[in-house]
Amino acid sequence: MEDFVRQCFNPMIVELAEKAMKEYGEDPKIETNKFAAICTHLEVCFMYSDFHFINELGESVIIESGDPNALLKHRFEIIEGRDRTMAWTVVNSICNTTRAEKPKFLPDLYDYKENRFVEIGVTRREVHIYYLEKANKIKSEKTHIHIFSFTGEEMATKADYTLDEESRARIKTRLFTIRQEMASRGLWDSFRQSERGEETIEERFEITGTMRRLANYSLPPNFSSLENFRVYVDGFEPNGCIESKLSQMSKEVNARIEPFSKTTPRPLRIPGGPPCHQRSKFLLMDALKLSIEDPSHEGEGIPLYDAIKCMKTFFGWKEPSIVKPHEKGINPNYLQAWKQVLAELQDLENEEKDPKTKNMKKTSQLKWALGENMAPEKVDFEDCKDINDLKQYDSDEPETRSLASWIQSEFNKACELTDSSWIELDEIGEDIAPIEYIASMRRNYFTAEVSHCRATEYIMKGVYINTALLNASCAAMDEFQLIPMISKCRTKEGRRKTNLYGFIIKGRSHLRNDTDVVNFVSMEFSLTDPRFEPHKWEKYCVHEIGDMLLRTAVGQVSRPMFLYVRTNGTSKIKMKWGMEIRRCLLQSLQQIESMIEAESSVKEKDMTKEFFENKSETWPIGESPKGVEEGSIGKVCRTLLAKSVFNSLYASPQLEGFSAESRKLLLIVQALRDNLEPGTFDIGGLYESIEECLINDPWVLLNASWFNSFLTHALK
């Protein structure tokens, strides 16, 4: 790698990178991947600045060669590449002359045209993840962030890419060339995998002085220092049988081990009450898409323009009316909010400027829907600590809900195939080792089975919505920003397709902590009449907004089109996990792999091909009241994926608790089926801990119902 760096980069860049590494006590000969990363970053900073000037009229111009006497000023001040002292001197000088806010961290450039500092990022990972790490580290809206990746993707604050397309294309081409050169020398994989997240001060935090002495004093007996204790804790592995653990417990604990037989377990008690309601962040089986094929309109790829183009494909709009009110809400406000969206989209079309984002007017209906000024006033603890009867307010127990049939229908629909492909095969290089060949083969077979699955559509929809909402929450904290809900796919014929599901309007979003909540109003198109299952739509106000002509076997029929509107909320940590929902593909692939491995070890050869291509064989999918359901290997792949996706979409403390506690009972039942004669104590306590998680969550209630079916058939 070191040789490659010296051949590939300009000697001046190499020298600057060496200096920078030595300044931090790092050796370019040892940390070669870091050496390459620093050189790449330096080169991108220089390319970003190259040929960009400001003329005597204060306009930004691009001049690659010309009159050396022209009165031109460099548009960008390069800060990256200077030693720290000099770099801070330059930053201070800029702040003094331009009145710019002083950044906490050294930026890479200063843009004299836009009057802002610029942070350049070059990542080997996904751009949105690296962008968020940068934004979280910098924590300043004044510094503009621009991220490039080696795959040609880029991301910038407020989608403002600063430079013209040609300048950015030069940078992307150079990065792609570096990647190809590395790959041809077998260096790329190591370089790609070596990238770590943004380091923070906390990671290098050392306990010293008084705190160190206090830490050493507060250790358990027999430990002389914190280091010794850490080593012990890191290497600690509990072992020993149940009886020996019980003997160490208090003498007051009276635990007698009871035999566990087929008659011991009882079904889980599923609560009664009104039927459970839909609580996912966006509509699933009931969603309706307005789509455009082979998009080539002006501004294609900018969500706002994609959305307007999709809206224009529908001609059946009519005066909206409420068909299912929200019991507790001010329903006319939701109606006015939709009318406001339509009006402001129309205004956008009439404007001469082309804004990339749309901030809604802060009308009374939106303020109400987004909970503006509704948060209770915070009082400093110092001002009220002397109040004698200060206590936490009483909160009611959550109302229990019964299992409703709609959640099983949702799950069945998620396992079905659609007529579009939602994921592409990854462009990964040639396989070198035999194990890579097998892994690629499995991945390709699996991708073929799930690429058209509706659960995969939910994945891509979830990634888009969470990414867009988190970006808007960071970039436009005080604004009520309009965010289209968009996904992209390919038709059977391979044509690109852009889909619009509806819109989100986000509220104020000063998200300091991971759990701070941002409110949003979702408005989603649907053909589902809410009056058939009103309990499912308890949290929604539903409007009829148009009539859609549908082609059927008997000709065209007109169906009413509905808009499902609700106030919702999410947090930074939930959005981060929502962006990671692609991991569900990996989890379900690993489950399939373990099935293939089990089969391969019996046959003593790799069974991947036979596993996927033997269409006559069926596999167990799950339990139902009828018994064990079986299906093709493709159905198994899609069912496992749908379960993983629903675990993400319906994530909750109830699900966490139910999964952890029911697993214990599952293992005991499995041990009984394997004739291992399991023994238990306090089985009643285990049932209690499982059933306290069965409250009102639809996905948990469905899993409990499946668990009961499993118990019935497993113990026959």
UniProtKB/Swiss-Prot annotation:
Motif stretch (Nuclear localization signal 2 (NLS2)): 184-247
InterPro entries associated with the record: INFV_PA, PA/PA-X, PA/PA-X_sf
Coiled coil stretches, renumbered: none
Cofactor note: Binds 2 manganese ions per subunit.
One GO location term (cellular component): host cell nucleus
Cofactor(s) named in the record: Mn(2+)
Any one of the GO BP annotations: symbiont-mediated suppression of host mRNA transcription via inhibition of RNA polymerase II activity
Chain span(s) of sequence motif Nuclear localization signal 1 (NLS1): 124-139
Residues reported in the UniProt entry to bind Mn(2+) 1: 41, 108, 119-120
EC numbers on record: 3.1.-.-
Keyword annotations: Cap snatching, Endonuclease, Eukaryotic host gene expression shutoff by virus, Eukaryotic host transcription shutoff by virus, Host cytoplasm, Host gene expression shutoff by virus, Host nucleus, Host-virus interaction, Hydrolase, Inhibition of host RNA polymerase II by virus, Manganese, Metal-binding, Nuclease, Phosphoprotein
Compartments, record wording: Host cytoplasm; Host nucleus
Superkingdom assignment: Viruses
Binding site for Mn(2+) 2: 80, 108
GO molecular function: endonuclease activity; metal ion binding; RNA binding
Post-translational modification: Phosphorylated on serines and threonines by host kinases, including human casein kinase II.
Subunit structure: Influenza RNA polymerase is composed of three subunits: PB1, PB2 and PA. Interacts (via C-terminus) with PB1 (via N-terminus).
Assigned protein family: Belongs to the influenza viruses PA family.
HAMAP family: INFV_PA
Function: Plays an essential role in viral RNA transcription and replication by forming the heterotrimeric polymerase complex together with PB1 and PB2 subunits. The complex transcribes viral mRNAs by using a unique mechanism called cap-snatching. It consists in the hijacking and cleavage of host capped pre-mRNAs. These short capped RNAs are then used as primers for viral mRNAs. The PB2 subunit is responsible for the binding of the 5' cap of cellular pre-mRNAs which are subsequently cleaved after 10-13 nucleotides by the PA subunit that carries the endonuclease activity.
Name assigned to this protein: Polymerase acidic protein
